[in-house]
Amino acid sequence: MKKLRSSMTQRGFTLVELMVVVAIIGILAAIAVPAYQDYTVRAKLSEVIIALSACRTTITEIYQSGGSPPGANNWQCESGVLSSYVAGVTTDPDGRVSATIQGINPSVNDKVVTLTPLISDSTPASAALNMGSGLYGWRCGAAADGTNLPPQYLPSSCRGG
């Protein structure tokens, strides 16, 4: 009988070893899946920001050329935005652009992202006062401007304070 036992060698993995491997894979998946979901939401929101860049260009040109302010939703860029993730685009009288999000994730659908024209580092432009003087830049994603999207979903280029 002893001879029979000594000739049997272990081949393959034991049940305990397999269970440890399954547990490790489960832990890694629990960490990786939520991180990947956040990444995909940010990637899709980047498309929303790119869709708004047409309005940003149009409004910048109008500010530089001067003339009379066009008014809310009359900046001639609101209807040209084509994206499956943008439900609609609106502008206010000063050129602040807002996009309503759709088709991404229930946690961000129907939320709003804003782009705000600035005349200095932190001062929003006023069409009545700053027309013809050009713009300093744009602020993206600030809650003070109407963005109601959780900041962790915003692309890094759109986390304006």
Q: How would you name each of these model-derived features?
A:
Residues 1-16:
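N-terminal leader/signal peptides at the extreme start of proteins
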Residues 16, 29, 45-46:
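Alpha-helical structural signal
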Residues 16-20, 41:
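Internal alpha-helical transmembrane segments of multi-pass membrane proteins, especially GPCRs
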Residues 19-32:
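Alpha-helical hydrophobic helix detector
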Residues 26, 55, 158:
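Residue-level signature of catalytic and energy-coupling elements of molecular machines
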Residues 36-39:
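A short tyrosine-centered beta-strand micro-motif
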Residues 41-67:
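Membrane-proximal N-terminal amphipathic helix
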Residues 63-161:
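Periplasmic/extracellular, small/polar-rich flexible segments of pilin-like filament-forming proteins
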